[in-house]
C-alpha cells in the first residue's frame, strides 16, 4: 500500500534539516572562524582532521547504540536534535567563552556527534518505514532526497541572503536552523518506532572483522575524502584566486 504524501513529508523536512547542518561544518565554519577570530588555516585543518578521525571511531559505536537502544529512539533523537541545534548556535551565534580554537573544536564535536547519530537513526527508521508498504523504498527515497537537495541548497546561499537583513548573518542562520530542528522533530513525531525490528545486536568490532565490510569502508573513505577537502577549501579558493 503506497504511503500518503503527508506521512512522507516529515522525512523530507528531517532530511532537509540534516543536509543544512552538514554544509556549514565544512564550508562556512572554517571561513567564519578565520575571518572573525583570525584562526590560521593550519590550526583549523588540524582540528577538522582530528575530529574526522574521532568521527571514524565513534560512528560504529553510535550505530551500535542506535540498535541496542532502539526502544528509546524517540527521546534519543530528541536529545540529539537539541545538541545539534545548541552546537550550531554555539558555533556561529555565541562569542567563544574560551580560546576560539577550543570553542571551534568543542562545538564541532557536538555537531559531528549529533549529526552522525541522527543520520543513523533517520536512515534506520526509513528502512523500517519502507518495508511497511509496497514500493515504499522508492517513494520514501524520493521524498528524502528531495528534502536533502533543498536543505543543502538553502544552507549554501542562506548566509549571503541573510547578510541583507543583518550584520550577523551566521548568527541568524544558526537561530533559524534551531527553529528548523524543532519543525523537523514535530514533522517526524509519530515515526520513531524503533522497537519494531527484532534483530540481534552486533558489536562494532565484530562488524569490522568482516573483510568485505572493511573493503567497503575503505571505498567509502576514498569516495568521501575528496568531497570533504574540496568543500572546506572552496571558499578560500574563490576568495584568493577568483
Task: Describe each region flagged by the PLM.
Residues 1-242:
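Membrane-embedded alpha-helical bundles of multi-pass transporters/translocases
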Amino acid at each position: 500500500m503506497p504511503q500518503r504524501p503527508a506521512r512522507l513529508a516529515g522525512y523530507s523536512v528531517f532530511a532537509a534539516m540534516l543536509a543544512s547542518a552538514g554544509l556549514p561544518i565544512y564550508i562556512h565554519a572554517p571561513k567564519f572562524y578565520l575571518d572573525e577570530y583570525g584562526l590560521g588555516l593550519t590550526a583549523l585543518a588540524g582540528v577538522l582532521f582530528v575530529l574526522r578521525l574521532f568521527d571514524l571511531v565513534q560512528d560504529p559505536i553510535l550505530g551500535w547504540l542506535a540498535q541496542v537502544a532502539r526502544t528509546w529512539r524517540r527521546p534519543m533523537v530528541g536529545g540529539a536534535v537539541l545538541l545539534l541545534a545548541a552546537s550550531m548556535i554555539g558555533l556561529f551565534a555565541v562569542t567563544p567563552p574560551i580560546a576560539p580554537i577550543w570553542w571551534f573544536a568543542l562545538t564541532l564535536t557536538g555537531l559531528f556527534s549529533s549529526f552522525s547519530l541522527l543520520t543513523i537513526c533517520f536512515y534506520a527508521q526509513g528502512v523500517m518505514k519502507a518495508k511497511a508498504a509496497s514500493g515504499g523504498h522508492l517513494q520514501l527515497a524520493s521524498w528524502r532526497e528531495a528534502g536533502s537537495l533543498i536543505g543543502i541548497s538553502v544552507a549554501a546561499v542562506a548566509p549571503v541572503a541573510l547578510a541583507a537583513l543583518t550584520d550577523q548573518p551566521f548568527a541568524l542562520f544558526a537561530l533559524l536552523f534551531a527553529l528548523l530542528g524543532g519543525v523537523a522533530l514535530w514533522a517526524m513525531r509519530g515515526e520513531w518506532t524503533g522497537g519494531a525490528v527484532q534483530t540481534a545486536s552486533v558489536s562494532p568490532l565484530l562488524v569490522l572483522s568482516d573483510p568485505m565490510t572493511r573493503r567497503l569502508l575503505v571505498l567509502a573513505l576514498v569516495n568521501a575524502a575528496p568531497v570533504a577537502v574540496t568543500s572546506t577549501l572552496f571558499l578560500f579558493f574563490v576568495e584568493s584566486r577568483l
